Structure formats: structure tokens, C-alpha cells
């Protein structure tokens, strides 16, 4: 431990010790950021939070000791605890805490973007920025070395210049063109906010500490330029460049992992925010190979992930944004790799549903569209239409373009369908084709509500029939989502593992108690089956909420009734089931037509149907309460956060149905949640698990 110089008369008196400075300024904000970010931290984020502080500590320690040794800054003895070398122990903590603050802040700012959308090779006409950035850093390095002469006014400035230029040259070479490819909204603005947020905060804390004598900048080794009162330009530069280094490192990590995810062989789990084994040497070799890869290089076309072009991913996710604002908002809480996968999965489900259930088309046209969707699934899985070898040699996008060329669809629908179908191609290694066929059975059931042959019409007679239908259109989606999440986390579920489709309400809290007491071991097939089974139950639960909300609109607009016939009270409401199937609901806007048409006898009121919707909600709530604890078993914290928020927000629609006013009930309006209610429900689910 080295003794410190005695303070001169020019130093301000120390009224704030270094450790109290940490307690007042750095630790609280670090703690707050950690609490906010913790539910969303991926394995990639954790890698940043581990590696970047370590690298910063190793790189800064000798430089900082040299700075203090040459008296560029100094400390009062009684304001520090002790020194290691020439530097107070609190200063070493500062290296780590600042790295954590900046990395956490950058994570919160940039987590909303999808880096895999911006890996398109740069065109020759677009000059790369990396050589210019590296050349600038080299010049700063040379000038900094020349200026860093001890006991001169340029010393501190020069030391910062050469010390920061080396890591900046390396990191900007690996990230600056990637940031430019992301554009202004997704790249430069988040980059700037990520840098300026911590920088402005640390400038403020530095002024506070300097005014209270926590540390002192030597005027003999400073330029003595103060752009902000009491804050030397060297201190401003130090915090600015260190945050640029940290943010550049974060963007570089994102770029490297995005490349690794898209270029991994199909038989290996790709590196991603959800799968990043830091204990494996192969991880670092793959990251380095991605780092040195030129932005002008194309990704290998042999990989299923790389066969999906970024513009198709973008178009698919745009379909999701237009089709389901609720799911799109909830998906923002997922890590970007799972947001891509599950977003594309849901987008294809919506595209397929729109194709099959287009209200403007006749039944025969809808049936043909159902066959088109089935052919699309076959093409994605390379099983039919043409020889398998030809399938594998033809890009999936081209295959689908040929398939859709003869379909009687508009160009816009063809484009959206091809983009959505192309984007699910990487998921074929996790999702068995039979699950898509199961979903198509549900779509077929929707079509048969209006079948000309009465014997083939869809009629849900019992609760078992309703559960079977809900399994096809929602339970299967729950299983798909869990299969994708587990696969992306490195625990691929066998494609031949079939899940029990029978839904049974159990004794209160039985499932919650069993899951809480005995965590699932996802290396055991039986426990994987349990998780998939509960995912299906959750899907059925949410589908029942959807049915309860839309009883009247489904009847009036689609001539459908998803409430099972045996749910209706035979004595009180005989004929209500058939009335709903025929759309004979007395709504204010067209009730007079029904009366004057002499059909008043068979007309039902929304108030009369409501009790059956509430009964369905009771069943849905029990299923939800039993299956919700299973979400805690998902081996991915941010995936848990996103799915809990999505399920909680959707299930809360049931509460909104129960709280509808008499006017809303009689008018047959759908129950809707405000954006504020959605946000509050999501926060409660993510942070308080309720």
C-alpha cells in the first residue's frame, strides 16, 4: 500500500468520503437499473455484465496507477479507505460499478431492437466507416502518446487519448458499420442515448465530488479548460470515451451473437441471447470468427436460419404488428432471438387464419385457401409437391413463391404469406409438422360451421368438443412456443414426443403445489411432457377467454357459436344455441328488423347469453390458475417475463368482461382493456408474479 501526498492549500476540504460518494451516487443507480432490468436479462446480457467489467478493470488498473503516480489527480487521506498500489480501493470499485451502470443502461435502451434484421451485406457503393474510425483512433493514439508527458498541462488529456484509442479502434472496427446498417432510429439514436445517459449522470456526480474534495484534479497536468463550471475537459472526455467504449462493446456483442445465430449448422444449437455457454472454449472461437467477419460477406446459405432474408423477417413481424397489438406489445419483453421466433410463429398463424377465414370469400374459396396453407406447410418441411432433393437445393423463399404463383390471392397477401412462411423455416427442427396439421384441423372446423351438408357442419355439443377445438387453435400454439423456447435454450424436445391433449380440472392448487415443491427437471422426458401439457392448458384457458368475449360478435358476424350445446339450460334457454348459430341476437342497431320479420320468438338478448359466457370464464380461470405456475419452470428468465406478461394481460380480459356495464352488455360490444391497464397488468406479472 502506497502513501498519498499531503494535500496542498489549493485543495478544497474533503467533506464527502469516496465510499460515501459510492453510497450516494453510484450504488443506488446501479441497484435501480439492476432491479428494472433483472427480469429481462438474457445470457448474453449477463455475459456483458461479467466480461465488460473484468476487461475494464484489467485495462484500466495499470493506467490509473500511472495517472495517480504522476499526480494527475490526488485524494485526501481521510477520504479513502486504503490503497492498492497508488489507487484507492474505492477507485477500483468505480471501474466495475461504472461498467455495470453503462451496460445495464445500454441493455434497457437497445433491447427493443432486433439486431438480426441488420446483417445484410453492405453494397460496394456504400463506403465502410470502419477504416476511417480505426484511422482516427490511430491518430489519437499517436498524438496522445506525444502529449502525455508528465508534469505538463497536456499530460492528463494525452493519457486519456492514447489509452482509450486502442480499445475504441478495435470495437469501432467491429461495430460501427453494423450500427450504420441499423439506421438512425434503431442504431445511431439508441447508441447516442446509451452513451449520453450515463455520461451526463457521471458528469454530475463528478462535479458533486470535486466540489466536496472527494478527489482533486492537478492543475499542473490539466489543460484547465472548464466547459462546465468545476468540471475539467479531461474529466468530461474520460467519462464520454469510457461510455463510448462500453456501448460499442455491447453493440459488438450483439452483432457477433446475431451472426453466430444465423450461421450455425442446423444440427447444433446456435449461440443466441438464450444460449451462450461461457464455460465452453468453442463459444469464444465462434464469437471471434463472427467479430472478424466482414460486413460485406454473405452468410452461409446452407443454414436454415440464414435462408431467411432480413426483409422477410421484417415483413413477417410487420404482419404481427398489424394483426395483434397485444401480442406484439408483450413480445417486446422477450429476448430478441425468441421475439423473432415466436413473433414469426404467431404471424404465420395469423396469416393462415386470415387466408382460411376471410369473411369476404365464399366457403369454396376458403376451402381452397386451406389447401394452400397445407401445401405451404409441406413445402416448408420439404415433404411433398416435388422431389426432396430439389427442395433442399431451392431456397425456401423461392419454393414458396412458385407455390403461391397460381393461388387466387392478391399480390399483397401472397407477399405476406410467403414472408411469414419463410420465417418459420428455422423452427422446423423444433416443431413437428403434425402440430401444424392439428392447427389446420381447427381452421377446418371453423369452415364447417357453414357447410352445405348439415351432417358435416361443426356443432360443439359438449365441453369435450370445445376443448378439442381449443386444443387445435390455441393449445397447439402453446406447445409450439415452449418447444421453440426449450430448443433455443439448448434443450431440444424430441419431435416424436406427443402430449396428452385431454384437459381435466383438478383439485385446487394441486398443480401449483407440485410445481413449487418439486421443480421440473427438463432433462427428463416426463417433466418435459408436464411442461408442454401445462402450456397446452394455458392455451386452452386463453382461448376460452376469447370465446367468452366474442359470443355475440361470433354469432352476429360469423353465424358461429363456440359455446357447447350441453352448456345451455334446457328448460330456460331452449333454442338459444340454434339462435346463436343463425345470428339471431337482438342488438340495438338491428333488433327492429328481427321483430318486423316475425322472428321475434327465436331472438335472444345479449343479457341472456352473458351467464354462459361467465360460466366459461370460471372454467378458464381455473385452468389459468392451475397452469400459470408452470411458466416459472421455463429455463429462460426473460422468456418467463414475456410469457407471464402476455398470458396475464390476455387473461385479464376475463376480468374486464365481468366488469362490463349494462349498456356494454346489451349492445354486444367486445370487452377491451386500455393501454394503461395492459401496462399495469404486465408490470404486476413481471415484477410481482401476480
Curated annotation (Swiss-Prot):
Catalysis: reaction(s): all-trans-lycopene = gamma-carotene; gamma-carotene = all-trans-beta-carotene; 2 (2E,6E,10E)-geranylgeranyl diphosphate = 15-cis-phytoene + 2 diphosphate
Its localization reads:
Membrane
Protein name per Swiss-Prot or TrEMBL? Bifunctional lycopene cyclase/phytoene synthase
Domain of life, per lineage = Eukaryota
How the protein sits in the membrane? Multi-pass membrane protein
- Region feature Phytoene synthase, mapped onto this chain: 262-686
Q: Which Enzyme Commission number(s) are listed?
A: 5.5.1.19, 2.5.1.32
Signal peptide, first to last residue: none
- Give GO BP annotations, semicolon-separated: carotenoid biosynthetic process
Q: Where are the transmembrane segments?
A: 21-41, 48-68, 92-114, 129-149, 156-176, 183-203, 231-251
A Pfam cross-reference name: SQS_PSY
Chief localization class?
membrane
Q: Which family does it belong to?
A: In the N-terminal section; belongs to the lycopene beta-cyclase family.
Q: Name one GO molecular function term.
A: 15-cis-phytoene synthase activity
A GO cellular component annotated for this chain's UniProt record is: membrane
Task: Give the record's pathway.
Answer: Carotenoid biosynthesis; beta-carotene biosynthesis; Carotenoid biosynthesis; phytoene biosynthesis; all-trans-phytoene from geranylgeranyl diphosphate: step 1/1
Name the keywords, alphabetized: Carotenoid biosynthesis, Isomerase, Membrane, Multifunctional enzyme, Transferase, Transmembrane, Transmembrane helix
Region (Lycopene beta-cyclase) residue spans: 1-255
Q: What exactly does this protein do?
A: Bifunctional enzyme that catalyzes the reactions from geranylgeranyl diphosphate to phytoene (phytoene synthase) and lycopene to beta-carotene via the intermediate gamma-carotene (lycopene cyclase).
PANTHER family in alphabetical order: BIFUNCTIONAL LYCOPENE CYCLASE/PHYTOENE SYNTHASE
Amino acid at each position: 500500500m502506497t502513501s498519498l501526498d499531503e494535500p496542498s492549500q489549493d485543495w478544497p476540504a474533503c467533506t464527502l468520503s469516496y465510499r460515501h460518494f459510492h453510497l450516494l451516487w453510484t450504488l443506488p443507480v446501479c441497484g435501480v437499473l439492476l432491479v428494472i432490468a433483472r427480469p429481462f436479462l438474457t445470457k448474453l446480457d449477463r455475459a456483458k455484465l461479467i466480461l465488460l467489467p473484468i476487461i475494464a478493470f484489467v485495462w484500466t488498473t495499470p493506467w490509473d496507477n500511472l495517472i495517480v503516480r504522476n499526480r494527475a489527480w490526488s485524494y485526501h487521506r481521510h477520504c479513502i479507505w486504503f490503497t492498492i498500489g497508488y489507487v484507492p480501493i474505492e477507485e477500483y470499485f468505480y471501474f466495475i460499478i461504472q461498467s455495470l451502470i453503462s451496460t445495464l443502461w445500454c441493455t434497457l435502451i437497445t433491447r427493443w431492437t432486433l439486431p438480426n434484421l441488420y446483417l445484410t451485406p453492405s453494397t460496394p457503393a456504400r463506403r465502410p466507416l470502419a477504416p476511417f474510425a480505426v484511422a482516427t483512433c490511430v491518430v489519437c493514439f499517436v498524438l496522445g502518446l506525444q502529449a502525455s508527458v508528465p508534469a505538463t498541462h497536456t499530460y492528463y488529456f494525452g493519457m486519456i487519448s492514447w489509452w482509450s484509442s486502442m480499445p475504441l479502434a478495435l470495437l469501432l472496427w467491429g461495430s460501427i458499420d453494423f450500427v450504420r446498417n441499423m439506421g438512425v432510429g434503431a442504431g445511431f439514436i439508441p447508441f447516442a442515448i446509451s452513451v449520453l445517459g450515463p455520461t451526463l449522470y457521471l458528469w454530475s456526480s463528478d462535479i458533486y465530488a470535486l466540489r466536496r474534495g472527494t478527489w482533486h484534479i492537478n492543475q499542473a497536468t490539466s489543460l484547465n479548460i472548464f466547459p462546465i463550471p468545476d468540471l475539467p475537459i479531461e474529466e468530461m472526455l474520460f467519462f464520454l470515451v469510457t461510455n463510448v467504449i462500453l456501448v460499442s462493446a455491447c453493440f459488438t456483442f450483439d452483432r457477433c451473437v446475431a451472426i453466430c445465430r444465423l450461421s450455425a449448422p442446423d444440427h447444433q444449437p446456435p449461440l443466441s441471447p438464450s444460449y451462450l455457454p461461457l464455460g465452453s472454449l468453442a463459444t469464444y472461437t465462434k464469437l471471434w470468427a463472427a467479430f472478424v467477419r466482414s460486413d460485406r460477406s454473405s452468410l452461409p446459405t446452407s443454414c436454415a436460419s440464414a435462408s431467411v432474408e432480413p426483409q422477410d423477417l421484417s415483413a413477417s413481424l410487420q404482419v404481427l404488428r398489424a394483426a395483434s397489438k397485444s401480442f406484439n406489445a408483450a413480445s417486446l419483453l422477450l429476448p430478441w432471438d425468441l421475439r423473432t421466433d415466436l413473433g414469426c410463429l404467431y404471424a404465420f398463424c395469423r396469416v393462415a387464419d386470415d387466408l382460411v377465414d376471410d369473411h369476404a370469400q365464399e366457403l369454396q374459396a376458403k376451402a381452397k385457401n386451406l389447401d394452400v396453407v397445407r401445401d405451404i406447410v409441406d413445402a416448408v418441411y420439404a415433404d411433398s409437391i416435388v422431389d426432396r432433393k430439389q427442395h433442399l437445393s431451392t431456397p425456401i423463399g423461392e419454393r414458396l413463391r412458385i407455390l403461391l404463383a397460381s393461388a387466387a390471392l392478391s399480390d399483397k397477401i401472397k407477399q405476406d404469406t410467403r414472408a411469414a412462411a419463410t420465417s418459420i423455416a428455422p423452427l422446423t427442427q423444433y416443431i413437428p409438422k403434425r402440430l401444424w396439421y392439428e392447427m389446420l384441423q381447427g381452421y377446418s372446423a371453423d369452415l364447417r360451421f357453414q357447410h352445405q351438408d348439415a351432417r358435416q357442419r361443426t356443432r360443439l355439443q359438449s365441453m369435450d368438443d370445445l376443448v378439442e377445438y381449443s386444443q387445435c387453435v390455441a393449445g397447439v400454439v402453446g406447445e409450439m412456443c415452449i418447444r421453440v423456447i426449450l430448443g433455443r435454450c439448448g434443450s431440444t424436445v424430441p419431435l416424436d414426443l406427443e402430449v396428452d391433449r385431454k384437459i381435466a380440472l383438478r383439485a385446487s392448487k394441486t398443480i401449483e403445489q407440485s410445481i413449487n415443491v418439486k421443480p421440473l427437471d427438463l432433462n427428463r422426458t416426463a417433466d418435459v411432457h408436464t411442461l408442454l401439457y401445462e402450456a397446452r392448458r394455458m392455451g386452452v384457458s386463453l382461448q376460452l377467454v376469447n370465446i367468452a368475449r366474442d359470443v355475440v360478435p361470433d354469432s352476429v358476424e360469423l353465424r358461429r357459436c363456440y359455446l357447447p350445446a350441453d352448456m345451455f339450460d334446457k328448460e330456460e334457454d331452449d333454442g338459444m344455441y340454434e339462435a346463436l348459430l343463425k345470428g339471431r341476437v337482438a342488438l340495438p342497431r338491428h333488433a327492429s328488423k328481427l321483430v318486423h320479420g316475425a322472428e321475434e320468438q327465436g331472438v335472444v338478448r345479449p343479457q341472456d347469453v352473458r351467464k354462459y359466457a361467465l360460466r366459461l370464464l370460471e372454467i378458464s380461470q381455473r385452468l389459468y390458475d392451475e397452469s400459470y405456475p408452470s411458466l416459472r419452470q421455463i429455463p429462460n428468465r426473460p422468456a418467463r417475463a414475456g410469457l407471464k406478461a402476455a398470458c396475464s394481460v390476455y387473461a385479464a380480459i376475463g376480468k374486464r368482461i365481468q366488469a362490463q356495464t349494462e349498456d356494454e352488455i346489451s349492445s354486444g360490444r367486445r370487452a377491451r382493456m386500455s393501454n394503461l391497464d395492459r401496462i399495469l397488468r404486465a408490470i404486476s406479472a413481471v415484477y410481482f408474479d401476480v
